UniProtKB/Swiss-Prot annotation:
Superkingdom in the source lineage: Bacteria
Protein name (database record): Galactose-6-phosphate isomerase subunit LacB
GO biological process: D-allose catabolic process; galactose catabolic process; lactose catabolic process via tagatose-6-phosphate; pentose-phosphate shunt, non-oxidative branch
Organism: Streptococcus mutans serotype c (strain ATCC 700610 / UA159)
InterPro entries, alphabetized: LacB, RpiB_LacA_LacB, RpiB_LacA_LacB_sf
Family: Belongs to the LacAB/RpiB family.
Pathway(s) of this molecule: Carbohydrate metabolism; D-galactose 6-phosphate degradation; D-tagatose 6-phosphate from D-galactose 6-phosphate: step 1/1
E.C. no: 5.3.1.26
Reactions it catalyzes: aldehydo-D-galactose 6-phosphate = keto-D-tagatose 6-phosphate
Disulphide connectivity of cysteines: none
Amino acid sequence: MKIAIGCDHIVTDVKMELSKHLKEEGYEVLDVGTYDFTRTHYPIFGKKVGEAVSSGEADLGVCMCGTGVGISNAANKVPGVRTALVRDMTSALYSKEELNANVVSFGGAIIGKLLLFDIVDAFIKAQYKPTEENKKLIAKIKHLEAHNDKQADPHFFDEFLEKWNRGDYHD
């Protein structure tokens, strides 16, 4: 099974430890970045994880930023992706078993590393339990998706990166 992982610069160290853990558990890891602590934008990596899962390049995905909020929202914008921002085992299992979530997101600065590993392991092993009600709920979620051709452009974030490089954004 191949797991796509991605993060922003705030939690690169946590992502690298998760990558090592997943490999030790026997999973193939597709690391879409970021790879260092140079300031970057979480939507880039949420989108990359989402696209890897949506295209079938990866079976499941894990996203992380400081709080998990931004990157989970970015991943959820990719058609075919159902991302759950979780901080506990119950939410992670519910998202996979009932809503067939295919990406799980975390606040790497919020949740402890060992709990994160346990949740990711359980999320990967959990099985979707299809029921008529679950199928209807997922169909309603899928109906909300609208394909945006601009979003598929690999240069979608270039404008924002140029602004960052000019110093238009400040922490």
